[in-house]
Amino acid sequence: MPDGEVNKLRDVIDKKILDARRVFFSEPVTDKSAADAIKKLWYLELSHPGQPIVFVINSPGGSVDAGFAVWDQIKMMTSPVTTVVTGLAASMGSVLSLCAAPGRRFATPHSRIMIHQPSIGGPITGQATDLDIHAREILKTKKRIVDVYLEATGQPREVIEKAIDRDMWMTADEAKDFGLLDGILFSFDDL
């Protein structure tokens, strides 16, 4: 299929998905992917305020700041958002899966969820004072993430802090039992 036809088909598919009031987030959480998701979410919000939106997540995680940008925008909308994990919601992807109101957080049966504490990638260099600033900032970020998991699950702080000490992988059923999900979704008709 020539490139022009592929792009045209992609546009038709994207329009059909948006017409169904669904936003797919199937990539790492970056500034660009977050901006794209926010634009689609607000397009749906402004087109038909208050109408339900389904936010489908399959993400290995990524930028905490970009993820919280999506989180904050969803919380500001009047449209009720339902999150559906399909495949993987790891790291910041798992946090995004919790931006829906209680009762609106689902996963498909074979999905996996991974929670952990935030990390800094790459070599860190700089003056001791700068390193201290970075250390304090990542601890603030860890607290924000712990608070999200606390609010979503109702688990005690000690349980959450222990759970995220290392990568904690869960099946959809395990994530539901832990309080990260409200249910397992077998069909979009069940929403």
UniProtKB/Swiss-Prot annotation:
Subcellular location: Cytoplasm
Stretch forming the signal peptide: none
Keyword Transmembrane helix recorded: no
UniProt cross-references to PROSITE patterns, sorted A to Z: CLP_PROTEASE_HIS
EC supergroup of this enzyme: hydrolase
Active-site residue numbers: S91 (nucleophile), H116
One cellular component (GO) term of this entry: cytoplasm
GO biological process terms, semicolon-separated: protein quality control for misfolded or incompletely synthesized proteins
GO molecular function, one term: ATP-dependent peptidase activity
Assigned keywords, A-Z: Cytoplasm, Hydrolase, Protease, Serine protease
The organism's place on the tree of life at top rank: Bacteria
EC number of the protein: 3.4.21.92
Reactions this protein catalyses: Hydrolysis of proteins to small peptides in the presence of ATP and magnesium. alpha-casein is the usual test substrate. In the absence of ATP, only oligopeptides shorter than five residues are hydrolyzed (such as succinyl-Leu-Tyr-|-NHMec, and Leu-Tyr-Leu-|-Tyr-Trp, in which cleavage of the -Tyr-|-Leu- and -Tyr-|-Trp bonds also occurs)
Transmembrane helix in keyword set: no
HAMAP family to which the protein is assigned, alphabetical: ClpP (MF_00444)
Role description: Cleaves peptides in various proteins in a process that requires ATP hydrolysis. Has a chymotrypsin-like activity. Plays a major role in the degradation of misfolded proteins.
Protein family: Belongs to the peptidase S14 family.
Subunit-structure text: Fourteen ClpP subunits assemble into 2 heptameric rings which stack back to back to give a disk-like structure with a central cavity, resembling the structure of eukaryotic proteasomes.
Protein name: ATP-dependent Clp protease proteolytic subunit 1
Provenance organism: Chlamydia caviae (strain ATCC VR-813 / DSM 19441 / 03DC25 / GPIC) (Chlamydophila caviae)
Gene symbol of the encoding locus: clpP1
